[in-house]
Amino acid sequence: MKFLDEAKVYVRSGDGGPGCVSFRREKFIEFGGPNGGDGGRGGDVWIECVQGLNTLIDYRYRQHFKARKGEHGMGSNCHGAKGDDAVLQVPAGTQVFAEDGETLIADMTEVGQRVRLAKGGNGGFGNAYFTTSTNRAPRHANPGQEGQEMWLILRLKLIADAGLVGLPNAGKSTFLATVTAAKPKIADYPFTTLHPGLGVVRSDAREFVLADIPGLIEGAHEGVGLGDRFLAHVERCRVLLHLVEGTSEHAGKAYKLVRRELEAYGGGLADKPEIVALSKADALDPDTLKNQVARLKRAAGGKPLVLSAASGQGVQEALRAIQAQLDGEDAADETAEPAEPWHP
Protein backbone atom coordinates (compact mmCIF):
# COMPACT_ATOMS: atom_id res chain seq x y z
CA MET A 1 0.00 0.00 0.00
CA LYS A 2 1.26 3.47 -0.84
CA PHE A 3 1.87 5.94 1.98
CA LEU A 4 0.00 9.23 1.67
CA ASP A 5 0.22 11.77 4.47
CA GLU A 6 -1.70 14.73 3.00
CA ALA A 7 -5.00 15.01 1.14
CA LYS A 8 -7.49 17.73 0.18
CA VAL A 9 -11.21 16.94 0.45
CA TYR A 10 -14.52 18.70 -0.14
CA VAL A 11 -17.32 18.19 2.38
CA ARG A 12 -20.92 19.34 2.34
CA SER A 13 -23.61 18.71 4.92
CA GLY A 14 -27.15 17.98 3.81
CA ASP A 15 -29.80 20.64 3.20
CA GLY A 16 -32.83 20.59 5.46
CA GLY A 17 -36.01 19.19 3.94
CA PRO A 18 -38.81 21.65 3.04
CA GLY A 19 -41.94 21.90 5.16
CA CYS A 20 -45.29 20.74 3.80
CA VAL A 21 -48.45 22.72 3.02
CA SER A 22 -51.32 20.38 3.79
CA PHE A 23 -54.85 20.50 5.27
CA ARG A 24 -56.84 17.90 7.05
CA ARG A 25 -59.44 16.36 4.77
CA GLU A 26 -61.92 14.15 6.57
CA LYS A 27 -65.60 13.37 6.15
CA PHE A 28 -67.93 15.49 8.26
CA ILE A 29 -65.06 17.80 9.32
CA GLU A 30 -65.58 20.99 7.37
CA PHE A 31 -62.63 23.02 8.64
CA GLY A 32 -59.93 20.45 9.27
CA GLY A 33 -57.15 23.01 9.57
CA PRO A 34 -53.50 22.82 8.50
CA ASN A 35 -51.54 19.64 9.22
CA GLY A 36 -48.35 20.05 7.15
CA GLY A 37 -45.31 18.54 8.89
CA ASP A 38 -41.80 19.97 9.19
CA GLY A 39 -38.93 18.89 6.92
CA GLY A 40 -36.17 16.67 8.26
CA ARG A 41 -32.76 17.98 9.25
CA GLY A 42 -29.91 17.49 6.78
CA GLY A 43 -27.18 14.98 7.51
CA ASP A 44 -23.94 16.03 9.22
CA VAL A 45 -20.37 15.43 8.06
CA TRP A 46 -18.18 13.72 10.67
CA ILE A 47 -14.57 12.67 10.83
CA GLU A 48 -13.78 9.56 12.84
CA CYS A 49 -10.52 8.03 14.01
CA VAL A 50 -10.53 4.26 13.40
CA GLN A 51 -8.26 1.30 14.04
CA GLY A 52 -6.37 -0.39 11.22
CA LEU A 53 -5.54 2.63 9.04
CA ASN A 54 -2.05 4.09 8.71
CA THR A 55 -2.30 6.24 5.58
CA LEU A 56 -4.65 8.67 3.82
CA ILE A 57 -4.42 6.80 0.51
CA ASP A 58 -8.23 6.41 0.28
CA TYR A 59 -8.58 10.16 -0.19
CA ARG A 60 -6.43 10.14 -3.32
CA TYR A 61 -9.26 8.42 -5.19
CA ARG A 62 -12.25 10.08 -3.57
CA GLN A 63 -12.23 13.74 -2.57
CA HIS A 64 -15.93 14.70 -2.33
CA PHE A 65 -18.12 13.76 0.62
CA LYS A 66 -21.74 14.88 0.83
CA ALA A 67 -24.33 14.09 3.48
CA ARG A 68 -27.92 13.39 2.39
CA LYS A 69 -30.70 15.98 2.38
CA GLY A 70 -33.50 15.86 4.93
CA GLU A 71 -36.79 14.38 3.75
CA HIS A 72 -39.84 16.52 2.91
CA GLY A 73 -42.48 17.11 5.53
CA MET A 74 -45.82 15.44 4.81
CA GLY A 75 -49.48 15.76 5.69
CA SER A 76 -51.06 14.48 8.90
CA ASN A 77 -48.30 16.35 10.78
CA CYS A 78 -45.68 13.84 9.62
CA HIS A 79 -42.18 15.25 9.90
CA GLY A 80 -39.48 14.35 7.36
CA ALA A 81 -36.68 11.94 8.28
CA LYS A 82 -33.17 13.23 8.99
CA GLY A 83 -30.66 12.86 6.15
CA ASP A 84 -27.89 10.26 6.44
CA ASP A 85 -24.54 11.48 7.76
CA ALA A 86 -21.27 11.32 5.82
CA VAL A 87 -18.31 9.94 7.80
CA LEU A 88 -14.63 10.33 6.89
CA GLN A 89 -12.52 7.59 8.48
CA VAL A 90 -8.90 8.45 9.19
CA PRO A 91 -5.96 6.95 11.11
CA ALA A 92 -4.87 8.23 14.49
CA GLY A 93 -2.59 11.24 14.11
CA THR A 94 -4.62 12.99 11.41
CA GLN A 95 -5.02 16.75 11.66
CA VAL A 96 -7.82 18.60 9.89
CA PHE A 97 -7.07 22.10 8.58
CA ALA A 98 -9.20 24.70 6.85
CA GLU A 99 -8.49 25.40 3.18
CA ASP A 100 -5.81 27.95 4.11
CA GLY A 101 -3.75 25.09 5.51
CA GLU A 102 -3.09 26.92 8.78
CA THR A 103 -6.36 26.99 10.76
CA LEU A 104 -6.53 23.78 12.79
CA ILE A 105 -10.07 22.41 13.03
CA ALA A 106 -9.52 19.00 14.62
CA ASP A 107 -6.65 16.88 15.88
CA MET A 108 -7.55 13.19 15.74
CA THR A 109 -5.28 11.49 18.26
CA GLU A 110 -7.30 8.58 19.69
CA VAL A 111 -9.18 5.68 18.11
CA GLY A 112 -12.90 6.28 18.52
CA GLN A 113 -12.58 10.07 18.53
CA ARG A 114 -15.33 11.70 16.45
CA VAL A 115 -15.65 15.36 15.43
CA ARG A 116 -18.44 17.05 13.49
CA LEU A 117 -17.01 19.05 10.59
CA ALA A 118 -20.22 20.39 9.03
CA LYS A 119 -23.69 20.59 10.57
CA GLY A 120 -26.74 19.70 8.49
CA GLY A 121 -29.32 22.38 7.71
CA ASN A 122 -32.50 22.60 9.78
CA GLY A 123 -35.71 21.37 8.21
CA GLY A 124 -38.30 23.93 7.10
CA PHE A 125 -41.51 24.43 9.08
CA GLY A 126 -44.76 23.05 7.69
CA ASN A 127 -47.88 25.23 7.50
CA ALA A 128 -49.18 23.84 10.79
CA TYR A 129 -46.38 25.75 12.53
CA PHE A 130 -47.64 29.10 11.24
CA THR A 131 -51.19 28.79 12.60
CA THR A 132 -52.16 31.82 14.71
CA SER A 133 -55.34 33.23 16.22
CA THR A 134 -55.75 35.51 13.21
CA ASN A 135 -54.54 33.13 10.50
CA ARG A 136 -56.21 29.76 10.99
CA ALA A 137 -55.32 28.38 7.56
CA PRO A 138 -51.79 29.44 6.52
CA ARG A 139 -50.89 28.38 3.01
CA HIS A 140 -47.12 28.66 3.16
CA ALA A 141 -44.22 26.64 4.55
CA ASN A 142 -40.47 27.15 4.92
CA PRO A 143 -37.84 25.69 2.62
CA GLY A 144 -35.09 23.79 4.39
CA GLN A 145 -31.92 25.53 5.53
CA GLU A 146 -28.90 25.00 3.29
CA GLY A 147 -26.07 22.82 4.53
CA GLN A 148 -22.47 23.91 5.06
CA GLU A 149 -19.71 23.27 2.54
CA MET A 150 -15.95 23.66 2.70
CA TRP A 151 -12.63 22.38 1.43
CA LEU A 152 -10.41 20.79 4.07
CA ILE A 153 -6.81 19.61 4.21
CA LEU A 154 -6.02 16.36 6.01
CA ARG A 155 -2.48 15.87 7.27
CA LEU A 156 -1.24 12.70 8.90
CA LYS A 157 1.45 12.89 11.53
CA LEU A 158 2.27 9.44 12.82
CA ILE A 159 1.71 9.09 16.55
CA ALA A 160 4.62 7.38 18.26
CA ASP A 161 6.16 7.47 21.70
CA ALA A 162 9.70 7.61 20.33
CA GLY A 163 11.15 8.50 16.95
CA LEU A 164 14.37 7.47 15.22
CA VAL A 165 16.10 10.41 13.55
CA GLY A 166 19.40 10.77 11.76
CA LEU A 167 21.04 11.08 8.37
CA PRO A 168 20.27 8.54 5.64
CA ASN A 169 21.89 5.12 6.15
CA ALA A 170 22.38 5.68 9.90
CA GLY A 171 20.89 2.29 10.78
CA LYS A 172 17.42 3.43 11.83
CA SER A 173 15.50 0.74 9.94
CA THR A 174 17.86 -1.97 11.16
CA PHE A 175 17.31 -0.84 14.73
CA LEU A 176 13.51 -0.83 14.24
CA ALA A 177 13.61 -4.34 12.75
CA THR A 178 15.78 -5.58 15.63
CA VAL A 179 13.60 -4.34 18.50
CA THR A 180 10.13 -4.75 16.93
CA ALA A 181 8.25 -7.10 14.62
CA ALA A 182 8.24 -4.46 11.87
CA LYS A 183 9.88 -5.42 8.58
CA PRO A 184 11.16 -2.23 6.94
CA LYS A 185 13.21 -2.35 3.76
CA ILE A 186 16.91 -2.51 4.67
CA ALA A 187 19.82 -2.02 2.27
CA ASP A 188 23.31 -0.54 2.28
CA TYR A 189 22.49 2.68 0.45
CA PRO A 190 20.98 6.04 1.47
CA PHE A 191 17.22 6.72 1.29
CA THR A 192 16.24 3.05 1.51
CA THR A 193 13.39 4.22 3.77
CA LEU A 194 11.07 6.51 1.81
CA HIS A 195 8.07 6.46 4.16
CA PRO A 196 7.75 6.56 7.96
CA GLY A 197 7.23 3.20 9.65
CA LEU A 198 5.94 2.12 13.06
CA GLY A 199 6.73 -0.79 15.37
CA VAL A 200 5.83 -1.78 18.93
CA VAL A 201 8.73 -2.33 21.33
CA ARG A 202 8.26 -4.70 24.27
CA SER A 203 10.99 -4.33 26.86
CA ASP A 204 11.03 -5.15 30.59
CA ALA A 205 7.28 -5.93 30.59
CA ARG A 206 6.59 -2.49 29.12
CA GLU A 207 5.76 -1.46 25.58
CA PHE A 208 5.90 1.69 23.49
CA VAL A 209 5.54 2.68 19.83
CA LEU A 210 8.72 3.46 17.88
CA ALA A 211 8.72 5.37 14.57
CA ASP A 212 11.36 5.07 11.86
CA ILE A 213 11.57 8.51 10.24
CA PRO A 214 13.21 8.61 6.77
CA GLY A 215 16.69 10.10 6.74
CA LEU A 216 17.11 13.87 6.87
CA ILE A 217 19.52 15.84 4.72
CA GLU A 218 20.76 19.42 4.72
CA GLY A 219 17.89 21.75 3.81
CA ALA A 220 15.22 19.32 5.03
CA HIS A 221 13.35 22.10 6.87
CA GLU A 222 12.88 23.84 3.49
CA GLY A 223 11.50 20.71 1.85
CA VAL A 224 14.72 19.34 0.35
CA GLY A 225 14.31 15.59 -0.04
CA LEU A 226 10.72 15.87 1.26
CA GLY A 227 12.31 16.69 4.58
CA ASP A 228 9.52 19.00 5.73
CA ARG A 229 7.05 16.11 5.35
CA PHE A 230 9.31 13.81 7.36
CA LEU A 231 9.92 16.39 10.08
CA ALA A 232 6.17 16.79 10.53
CA HIS A 233 6.03 13.20 11.78
CA VAL A 234 8.71 13.97 14.36
CA GLU A 235 6.35 16.53 15.94
CA ARG A 236 4.22 13.71 17.37
CA CYS A 237 7.13 11.84 18.95
CA ARG A 238 7.64 12.42 22.65
CA VAL A 239 11.28 11.27 22.72
CA LEU A 240 13.91 11.16 19.96
CA LEU A 241 16.61 8.53 19.54
CA HIS A 242 19.22 10.27 17.40
CA LEU A 243 21.37 7.70 15.61
CA VAL A 244 24.70 8.85 14.23
CA GLU A 245 26.44 6.48 11.84
CA GLY A 246 29.76 5.34 13.28
CA THR A 247 31.24 4.81 9.83
CA SER A 248 30.57 8.42 8.80
CA GLU A 249 33.53 10.72 8.18
CA HIS A 250 32.92 12.83 11.31
CA ALA A 251 30.27 11.81 13.85
CA GLY A 252 30.15 15.27 15.43
CA LYS A 253 29.42 17.05 12.14
CA ALA A 254 26.74 14.48 11.24
CA TYR A 255 25.04 15.09 14.58
CA LYS A 256 25.13 18.87 14.23
CA LEU A 257 23.66 18.77 10.71
CA VAL A 258 20.52 16.99 11.91
CA ARG A 259 20.25 19.26 14.95
CA ARG A 260 20.35 22.34 12.70
CA GLU A 261 17.47 20.96 10.64
CA LEU A 262 15.39 20.27 13.76
CA GLU A 263 16.00 23.79 15.06
CA ALA A 264 15.28 25.44 11.69
CA TYR A 265 11.99 23.55 11.27
CA GLY A 266 10.68 24.85 14.60
CA GLY A 267 7.58 23.39 16.22
CA GLY A 268 9.53 22.52 19.35
CA LEU A 269 11.45 19.68 17.66
CA ALA A 270 14.80 20.83 19.00
CA ASP A 271 13.37 20.94 22.54
CA LYS A 272 12.23 17.33 22.63
CA PRO A 273 14.09 14.93 24.93
CA GLU A 274 16.90 13.37 22.92
CA ILE A 275 18.98 10.25 23.37
CA VAL A 276 22.16 10.25 21.26
CA ALA A 277 23.70 6.98 20.10
CA LEU A 278 26.59 6.03 17.83
CA SER A 279 25.37 3.23 15.55
CA LYS A 280 27.16 0.50 13.58
CA ALA A 281 29.77 0.13 16.31
CA ASP A 282 30.53 -3.43 15.14
CA ALA A 283 31.99 -2.04 11.90
CA LEU A 284 34.65 0.06 13.67
CA ASP A 285 38.05 -0.86 15.04
CA PRO A 286 38.71 0.17 18.68
CA ASP A 287 40.73 3.31 17.85
CA THR A 288 38.22 4.63 15.32
CA LEU A 289 35.35 3.89 17.71
CA LYS A 290 37.09 5.82 20.48
CA ASN A 291 37.66 8.84 18.21
CA GLN A 292 34.07 8.88 16.92
CA VAL A 293 32.66 8.63 20.45
CA ALA A 294 34.85 11.56 21.53
CA ARG A 295 33.72 13.69 18.56
CA LEU A 296 30.07 12.91 19.20
CA LYS A 297 30.44 13.61 22.91
CA ARG A 298 31.84 17.09 22.19
CA ALA A 299 29.08 17.86 19.68
CA ALA A 300 26.18 16.57 21.79
CA GLY A 301 27.45 17.84 25.12
CA GLY A 302 27.18 14.43 26.77
CA LYS A 303 28.39 10.86 26.48
CA PRO A 304 26.53 9.00 23.70
CA LEU A 305 25.34 5.43 23.79
CA VAL A 306 27.27 2.99 21.64
CA LEU A 307 25.20 0.39 19.85
CA SER A 308 25.05 -2.04 16.99
CA ALA A 309 21.63 -3.27 15.91
CA ALA A 310 23.30 -6.05 13.91
CA SER A 311 25.15 -7.55 16.88
CA GLY A 312 22.78 -6.41 19.62
CA GLN A 313 25.41 -4.33 21.41
CA GLY A 314 23.84 -1.53 23.46
CA VAL A 315 20.31 -2.14 22.14
CA GLN A 316 18.70 -2.93 25.50
CA GLU A 317 20.50 0.03 27.08
CA ALA A 318 18.99 2.31 24.43
CA LEU A 319 15.49 0.90 24.99
CA ARG A 320 15.74 1.43 28.75
CA ALA A 321 16.89 5.01 28.19
CA ILE A 322 13.86 5.65 25.97
CA GLN A 323 11.49 4.11 28.53
CA ALA A 324 12.97 6.24 31.32
CA GLN A 325 12.37 9.40 29.28
CA LEU A 326 8.80 8.31 28.49
CA ASP A 327 8.07 7.73 32.17
CA GLY A 328 9.14 11.31 32.87
CA GLU A 329 6.94 12.59 30.04
CA ASP A 330 3.93 10.68 31.40
CA ALA A 331 4.25 12.47 34.73
CA ALA A 332 4.35 15.87 32.98
CA ASP A 333 1.33 15.05 30.77
CA GLU A 334 -0.90 14.48 33.80
CA THR A 335 -0.80 18.20 34.61
CA ALA A 336 -1.64 19.39 31.07
CA GLU A 337 -5.05 21.00 30.47
CA PRO A 338 -7.28 19.71 27.62
CA ALA A 339 -7.75 21.98 24.57
CA GLU A 340 -11.08 23.65 23.79
CA PRO A 341 -12.96 21.61 21.11
CA TRP A 342 -13.88 23.19 17.74
CA HIS A 343 -17.54 23.58 16.77
CA PRO A 344 -18.95 24.10 13.24
Swiss-Prot record:
Keyword Lipid metabolism: no
Gene3D superfamilies named in the record: GTP1/OBG domain, P-loop containing nucleotide triphosphate hydrolases
Top-rank EC class of the record's enzyme: hydrolase
Domain (Obg) ranges: 1-159
GO-annotated molecular function: GTP binding; GTPase activity; magnesium ion binding
GO annotations of cellular component type: cytoplasm
Keyword entries, A-Z: Cytoplasm, GTP-binding, Hydrolase, Magnesium, Metal-binding, Nucleotide-binding
Positions that bind Mg(2+): S173, T193
GO biological process terms on file: ribosome biogenesis
Keyword GTP-binding: yes
Cofactors required: Mg(2+)
Principal cellular location given in the protein's record: cytoplasm
Function summary: An essential GTPase which binds GTP, GDP and possibly (p)ppGpp with moderate affinity, with high nucleotide exchange rates and a fairly low GTP hydrolysis rate. Plays a role in control of the cell cycle, stress response, ribosome biogenesis and in those bacteria that undergo differentiation, in morphogenesis control.
Alphabetical list of HAMAP family matching this protein: GTPase_Obg
Record text on subunit structure and interactions: Monomer.
Protein's name according to its UniProt entry: GTPase Obg
Annotated organism of origin: Methylorubrum populi (strain ATCC BAA-705 / NCIMB 13946 / BJ001) (Methylobacterium populi)
Lineage: Bacteria, Pseudomonadati, Pseudomonadota, Alphaproteobacteria, Hyphomicrobiales
